[in-house]
């Protein structure tokens, strides 16, 4: 049996399927119901009848629009009607009142705001009486126990976004469509939806049949309509004569728990429970096609997605709006870290892999590109939050050093942080993280036993002057790019000895456990400028260690008064930043046999250095390698040579090494040299140290600048300079001479034969 009814002259048919909802809504004709319950009833009717019938094409789009306006009029009339209310609240019996209309047995909520302080709204006084006949004739009976937001055949626990529908104090939600360039939706609700066979023809805005006092008095004027956008769906040229309902904002508090009825801002109903599967959702049209319900703006910035077209646009809009209602559109990614955790279990030594470039593989010690750049970049540790709270009220000298980190201030800058920011990685909770940052951490049985001396190191740190710690950090600890064996020209014999007798026992202490003592001190002697410091940096890079560079001449000339304390602080920080490589240049200044005064500053400095060196050599816990360099090995006291287990001669570069140095230095400039000229340069640089060859190339590169006319050098472009030629090297040979005499070379050879270990 099919029944029909007429609304606004349009016929609306009802199928037997609509009879499956008997007694699902409130009895609107009841005179004992409160306005809150009647409001819920209209919302239930709107959702279960109008929307369902529209979705199943049981009623036309024009009929749906008329019903929507009719229900909105009655809904707003209930809220604005002069009905006696016990309290002025958000239309619930109590603060915990249910939005589905069920009775709540708790006591009424008594807010601080009373009804006397509210401006009365008598815009539709007779709407309740007029709505009884209209609703009863158009809609089937409903049950008051049905929960708002559910539909037949769908679980009741599926929630939908809440759509505010009252203008009297309701809170309008920003529309997703407000930012579309082709659809300028107002912040309020414009609830006109037409079928796809109709077009968007603007209709004249008719005056509201129930104007509010504010509108009638001229205090509140509706905003001018926006310009009409282009038609979305062609095919219908008729003009709608539907009225425009504009309700002003009243003084009722915002309703945050209003059930889903119709959406503010012109947003279509989201895909939810009331739409059966397989039924397409209605297509929304701009607000200017059929004037709808214009609500006062709320001042919030609406979400403005990119422009969408065709049917996929509407589905994406509904999906985005639904996700926003469910709280799935959170774009705050600042609280999440996407860094991949690195494993703490990595082999200490691996055989070389020829498939990896030299810049990344080093000499085969399994050094990754990421960690190798941090090989000897020691830094100050930022205190953890717990340690900051623990030590915030104490003085800097009483601080217990927190864990070690690897970020450092720029070299040479004075730091104001306390010395208490240093500690040994083995005693900190971030020790494993520290070892991950090292390309080849010195691991072995001694690492487990290192915790026994942590307490003594902590006590010494507490008693160390902050100025000395800052001095060591800024002046002695050196950072720079990692150095590979291929970066050092020549010295093949020295490299092989260092690898086999220094690096391998340190990296694989388990394989060399039978040795009485591991070689932890090295003496590099030879002419100046032959690469001794570069070798020290390379050893630190291969070990993944912190590189400390102490100049013996600087201790004597610049810091003689504090040299003893600086040496002590350097070894102390090195123990906190293990593994460490301490490089001491001009060691003959500290260990000279000519120092006779027992209490002189130089004597105290030498005593402190020997004491620290002896501790490193005899301790199985310290992961420290001490490398000393000198150009005057004959001046070292004979009794002190025993402290250096390996004494290696660093000779002048051979012809192959000199050719490599010249090519490397000229690769950054434009030059014009053939193979014969390169061979002549290599031959003429016999007896030159590596530093002398560098000075020669630098002087030759400046030659093209000397040939330029006397103009401003800043205005000269590199392309305007001529290439470097052999003639430039001829001119440079007139200014640069070898800095090493043959007598000195003979002395190095003789001393190496007597005390050296490289042959």
Curated annotation (Swiss-Prot):
Comp. bias regions, Polar residues: 381-418
Stretches of the chain forming a coiled coil according to its record: none
Domain of life the protein comes from: Eukaryota
Claim: Membrane is one of the keywords in the record: no
Protein localization: Nucleus matrix; Cytoplasm, Cytoskeleton, Microtubule organizing center, Centrosome
UniProt KW keywords: ATP-binding, Cell cycle, Cell division, Cytoplasm, Cytoskeleton, Microtubule, Mitosis, Nucleotide-binding, Nucleus, Phosphoprotein
Region annotated Disordered, chain positions: 89-111, 196-237, 258-290, 339-457
Subunit description: Interacts with AKAP8 (via C-terminus).
Record-given protein name: Fidgetin
């Amino acid at each position: 049996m099919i029944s029909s009814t007429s609304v606004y002259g349009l016929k609306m048919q009802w199928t037997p399927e609509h009879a499956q909802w008997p007694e699902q809504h409130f009895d609107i004709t009841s005179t004992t119901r409160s306005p809150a319950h009647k409001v819920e009833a209209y919302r239930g009717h709107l959702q279960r009848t109008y929307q369902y019938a529209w979705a199943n094409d049981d009623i036309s789009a024009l009929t749906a629009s008329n019903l929507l306006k009719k229900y909105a009029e009655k809904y707003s009339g209930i809220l604005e009607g002069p009905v006696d209310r016990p309290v002025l609240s958000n239309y619930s019996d109590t603060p915990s009142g249910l939005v589905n209309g069920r009775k709540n047995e708790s006591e009424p909520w008594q807010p601080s705001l009373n009804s006397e302080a509210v401006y009365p709204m008598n815009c539709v006084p007779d709407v309740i009486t007029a709505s009884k006949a209209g609703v009863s004739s158009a809609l089937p009976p409903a049950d008051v126990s049905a929960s708002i937001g559910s539909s037949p055949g769908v679980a009741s626990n599926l929630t939908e976004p809440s759509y505010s529908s009252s203008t009297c104090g309701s809170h309008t939600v920003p529309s997703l469509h407000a930012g579309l360039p082709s659809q300028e939706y107002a912040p309020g609700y414009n609830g006109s939806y037409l079928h796809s066979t109709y077009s968007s023809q603007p209709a004249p805005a008719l005056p509201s049949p129930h104007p509010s006092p504010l509108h009638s008095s001229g205090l509140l004027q509706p905003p001018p309509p926006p310009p009409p956008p282009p038609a979305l769906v062609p095919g219908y040229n008729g003009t709608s004569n539907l009225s425009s309902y504009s309700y002003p904002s009243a003084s009722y508090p915002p309703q945050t728990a209003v059930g889903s009825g119709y959406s503010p801002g012109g947003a279509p109903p989201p895909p939810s429970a009331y739409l059966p599967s397989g039924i397409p959702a209605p297509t929304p049209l701009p607000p200017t096609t059929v004037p709808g319900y214009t609500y006062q703006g709320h001042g919030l910035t609406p979400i403005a997605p990119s422009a969408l077209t065709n049917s996929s646009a509407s589905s994406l809009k509904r999906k985005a709006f639904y996700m926003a209602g469910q709280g799935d559109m959170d774009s705050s990614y600042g609280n999440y870290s996407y860094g991949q955790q690195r494993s703490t279990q990595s082999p200490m030594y691996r055989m070389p892999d020829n498939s990896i470039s030299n810049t990344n593989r080093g000499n085969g010690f399994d050094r990754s590109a990421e960690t190798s750049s941090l090989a000897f970049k020691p830094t100050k540790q930022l205190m953890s939050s717990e340690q900051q709270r623990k030590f915030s009220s104490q003085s800097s000298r009483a601080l217990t050093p927190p864990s070690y980190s690897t970020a450092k201030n720029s070299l040479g800058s004075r730091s104001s942080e306390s010395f208490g920011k240093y500690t040994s990685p083995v005693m900190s909770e971030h020790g494993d993280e520290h070892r991950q940052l090292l390309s080849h951490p010195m691991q072995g049985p001694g690492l487990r036993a290192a915790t026994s001396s942590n307490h003594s190191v902590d006590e010494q740190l507490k008693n160390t002057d902050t100025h000395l710690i800052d001095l060591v950090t800024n002046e002695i600890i050196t950072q720079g790019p990692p150095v590979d064996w291929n970066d050092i020209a020549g010295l093949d014999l020295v490299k092989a000895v260092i690898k086999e007798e220094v690096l391998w026992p340190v990296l694989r202490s388990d394989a060399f456990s039978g040795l009485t003592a591991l070689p932890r001190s090295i003496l590099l002697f030879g002419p100046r400028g032959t690469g001794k410091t570069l070798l020290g940096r390379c050893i630190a890079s291969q070990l993944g260690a912190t590189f400390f560079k102490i100049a013996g001449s600087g201790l004597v000339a610049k810091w003689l008064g504090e040299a003893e304390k600086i040496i002590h602080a350097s070894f102390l920080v090195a123990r906190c930043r293990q593994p460490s490589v301490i490089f001491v240049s001009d060691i003959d200044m500290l260990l000279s046999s000519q120092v006779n005064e027992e209490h002189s500053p130089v004597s105290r400095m030498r005593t402190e250095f020997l004491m620290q060196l002896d501790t490193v050599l005899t301790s199985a816990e310290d992961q420290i390698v001490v490398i000393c360099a000198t150009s005057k090995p004959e001046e070292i006291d004979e009794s002190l040579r025993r402290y250096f287990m390996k004494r290696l001669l660093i000779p002048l570069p051979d012809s192959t090494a000199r050719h490599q140095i010249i090519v490397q230095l000229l690769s950054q400039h434009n030059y014009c040299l053939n193979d014969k000229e390169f061979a002549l340069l290599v031959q003429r640089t016999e007896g030159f140290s590596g530093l002398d060859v560098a000075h020669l190339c630098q002087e030759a590169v400046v030659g093209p600048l000397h040939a330029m006319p006397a103009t401003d050098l800043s205005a000269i472009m590199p392309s305007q300079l001529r290439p470097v030629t052999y003639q430039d090297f001829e001119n440079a040979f007139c200014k640069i001479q070898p800095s090493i005499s043959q007598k000195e070379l003979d002395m190095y050879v003789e001393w190496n034969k007597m005390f050296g270990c490289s042959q």
